[in-house]
Amino acid sequence: GVVAHIGEDLKKKPGFDLKEGDKIVSLVSLSMTPLKIDKILAIHKDIDRVDIVGKAILFESALYAKMPDDMSEPLALAALDVAGAPAQARKLPKEGDSVLILGANGKSGVLCGWEAMKKVGPKGKVVGVVRNPKQVPGLLELGVYTDVIVADCTKPVEVMEAALAANDGKEYDLSICCVNIESCEMSAILPVHDDGLVYFFSMATSFTKAALGAEGIG
């Protein structure tokens, strides 16, 4: 949507780069966004999109992105739809870290790999996990992973063994789960060292399984 009004205090904040009239995309879940819908213009069932006339309120802490000028609106929205995960993939790793990405062939996985590769640098490692071996060559060609392994993310021991083998036997600093199926929680947790980070982006995540599983393995 188009920015209609900005609070005076926020306008004065150093580094704030928005102005009224800018076209932006909110990266905050609609379940957390105060939204007033005045009119529904169209419903696009094929792409899960609804065009409306209305107003939304974004708070200072909200993630957002300016609409790019060099791509179409549908393409930009498709890329930004999973922007929460790549934003964390940029924020969480440090230079030289090892990162494991489950669901490496999906849109969110590829974008996470791209951001993580830039952040960890040449001394770090970003390993993707896919289920289909046919996906490996294309992902390596894209250059978004240092290595891609084949494993079933619903089988934690299988994933752990393959992941550690791809990281010279070492546990990972960070794992990001982008798999859109259930029961992948332990596959994201097991390969990570004590005090490491596990980021669950998938909406299929059971945080009960994640919490109890992590507690159970110690």
Locate predicted features.
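Local beta-strand N-terminus motif with an aromatic residue
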Residues: G96, Y145, G169-D173, G216
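Conserved "cap/hinge" positions at secondary-structure junctions
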Residues: G7, V28-S29, P34, G103, ...
